[in-house]
């Protein structure tokens, strides 16, 4: 089963990469107010149900893919 895990900085956490991208876009004339850079993990999980896939992806995100102090994540089951 295909699962996507989206990892982003939590609100209020400094995002220097996002700020650098925002600055570059601004210098190119794009009126962007804020950019938050994150990570995307596309997983193929061998389970029977969507619920199992979501549970395993949540566990993997909490334990390995996201830093719970600085990042939040979202699991999307395809």
What is each of the regions a protein language model found here?
Residues 2-47, 52-78:
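Long, contiguous binding/interaction regions
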